[in-house]
């Protein structure tokens, strides 16, 4: 919460409320003297939050890419406190096999964060062309075996469950059973086995929910609605997300975007933000021991200037 610089009397937005951990901390720090808004795409999560928070926060069942339009319905056109987005998939969603996010639990191929949406993982896995499948697995999962995986998926259609898909993907990865190929160091907190289906499941989930496109829209909307002095804090969990946030902050903090060889500045761009975190903040060793899912988390923060 240090990066968000929470102070009583200001307005704050938790753009990805989830289980409400961040929202609870903001509510505590503002001592009930601030206006709080909580966004989530999952209607079930929002209902639980309503039970926990009551009238302490306003709940919005919406994708954070529609930040401005959603807040305007409540007469809010500017944010003077800050906006927080934690892009990690909710533990509640991962742990519920019936939501279809986990490659370790039996469930339908769903993966929709908002279950009112029509596109599901089943549609992508069983209906998309092989070339399109390979492209998203490579683009969103950064999986170098994407072509082989897409070919096997198409050959084994129809695929009905998460475990069936995970098994097909695992068979495409050379020496997938050799855990040494899937070790990642977490410092003194110990290593962890990375399942060979991790990248493919990430890619399908991101395609279903349009995660990167939503993030780009959210960043633009946040910058336009923040008042000078307010802060934007984003926690990412993989390189694609972090790259987008890093580049967005870099461009917003630039005072000139003219070509390097331009003799004079003609763009007239002004520096819009001050980057608070020159390097991303990562989880401490204690945090890693308490929650291994935080191993890839990176926090970046910026303060609006104009």
What are these regions (language model features)?
Residues 1-306:
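S-adenosyl-L-methionine-dependent methyltransferase catalytic core, i.e., the SAM/SAH-binding region
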């Amino acid at each position: 919460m240090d990066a968000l610089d929470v102070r009583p009397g200001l307005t704050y937005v938790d753009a990805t409320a989830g289980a409400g951990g961040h929202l609870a901390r903001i509510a505590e720090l503002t001592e009930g003297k601030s206006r709080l808004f909580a966004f989530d795409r999952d209607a079930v999560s929002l209902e639980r939050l309503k039970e926990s928070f009551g009238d302490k926060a306003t709940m919005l069942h919406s994708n954070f890419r529609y930040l401005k339009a959603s807040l305007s319905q409540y007469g809010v056109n500017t944010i003077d406190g800050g906006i927080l987005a934690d892009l990690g998939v909710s533990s509640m969603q991962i742990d519920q096999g019936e939501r279809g996010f986990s490659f370790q639990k039996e469930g339908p191929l769903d993966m929709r964060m908002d279950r009112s949406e029509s596109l599901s993982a089943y549609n992508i896995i069983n209906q998309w062309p092989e070339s399109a499948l390979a492209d998203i697995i490579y683009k969103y999962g950064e999986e170098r075996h994407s072509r082989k995986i897409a070919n096997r998926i198409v050959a084994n259609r129809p695929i009905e469950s998460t475990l069936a898909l995970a098994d097909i993907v695992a068979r495409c990865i050379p020496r997938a059973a050799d855990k040494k190929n899937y070790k990642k160091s977490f410092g003194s907190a110990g290593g962890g086995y990375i399942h060979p289906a991790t990248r493919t499941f990430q890619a399908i989930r991101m395609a279903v929910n349009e995660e990167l496109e939503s993030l780009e829209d959210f960043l633009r909307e946040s910058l336009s609605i923040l008042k000078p002095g307010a802060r934007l804090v984003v926690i990412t969990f993989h390189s694609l997300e972090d790259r987008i946030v890093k580049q967005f902050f870099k461009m917003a903090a630039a005072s000139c975007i003219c070509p390097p060889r331009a003799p004079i500045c003609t763009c007239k761009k002004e520096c819009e933000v001050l980057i608070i975190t020159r390097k991303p903040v990562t989880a401490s060793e204690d945090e890693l021991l308490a929650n291994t899912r935080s191993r890839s988390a990176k926090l970046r923060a910026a303060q609006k200037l104009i």
